Amino acid sequence: MDAPSIFTRKKVAYACATLCCLLWGSSYPAIKSGYELFQIATDDVPSKIVFAGYRFLFAGALLLLFALAQRKPIARLNSRQCGQLAILGVTQTSIQYIFFYVGLAFTTGVKGSIMNATGTFFSVLLAHFIYQNDRLSYNKAVGCILGFAGVMLVNVNHSLSDFSFVWQGDGFVVLAAFILSAATLYGKRISQTVDPTVMTGWQLAFGGLVLVGGGYLTGGTLAVHSAAAALVLAYLTLLSSIAFALWSVLLKHNRVSMIAPFNFVVPVAGTVLSAIFLGENILELKYAVALALVHRDLVGK
């Protein structure tokens, strides 16, 4: 009988989940810097999709090379598993990001951040109906509400006074969050028969390739104008490979409702790190309260 994985230990799982979300949070300022360095206009969605596609394509390739270095059989997949990985790549990476980027083009960053946080609710609710050992409880519901409140508080400003709902903007971001949640649960099932690193590598590479092709076909372009631009893309590639692979391992060995709420850390971490690296203002009481709410959500799971 195999020994329990180290990732089943709560302290290890929590530390790794926090690391993943801090890495994803750091992508906020990195992506903003990337748009400037690659000279991508704010409304140039196709070029943004190309940029994201290369990020995931390279991240997937990096993970597959890492799996090869560990002597894991990256090509020993049957036709059913290949189909599953293709579906996972198209949904979790391609379709999800297309809806996300198109949605952001028709809504504000504030509303987009809040709407995207609904993904945690979807993950917990879907897990409730799929897994018998992952039912929704009072504490989980309260924790999700507190975490969502923290995300909303980070985004409190005058723009919230007119919080209308636009389907092509806000609706697309919510739809992207739902697709990501559903695809993540699908990935959890695949990881029971395919190594998580191999699974993540193939889905990122395939999904990224679809994004690159789709971005170019719709008029997107991408040119490296400086070494700094290449370094930013390299960092985004590295953080994606580490965070997505580690997240897949965590979901394989733990309940979804135990890991998913850490996603509330991402927008808060993104705000804090943007303030540090992009010089944005963070010396406001709302940020401290938001961090406290998110922390209360995580320790109360």
Report residues per predicted region:
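Hydrophobic/aromatic residues within transmembrane alpha-helices
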Residues: 34, 51, 103, 129-136, ...
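Specific transmembrane alpha-helical segments of multi-pass solute transporters/efflux pumps
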Residues: 68-112, 116, 153, 236-254
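Glycine-/small-residue-enriched transmembrane alpha-helix faces in small-molecule transporters
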Residues: 1-50, 90, 162-189, 209, ...
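Hydrophobic transmembrane alpha-helices of multi-pass small-molecule transport proteins
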Residues: 63, 125-126, 138-157, 264, ...
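Juxtamembrane helix-entry segments on the extracytoplasmic side of multipass membrane proteins
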Residues: 9-14, 44-47, 77-83, 156-179, ...
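Helix-helix packing/entry segments at the starts of transmembrane helices
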Residues: 54, 93, 111-118, 185-209, ...
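Specific alpha-helical transmembrane segments that line the substrate/conduction pathway
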Residues: 50-52, 57, 61, 91-92, ...
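Transmembrane alpha-helices of multi-pass small-molecule transport proteins
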Residues: 37-92, 122-126, 179-183, 200-218, ...
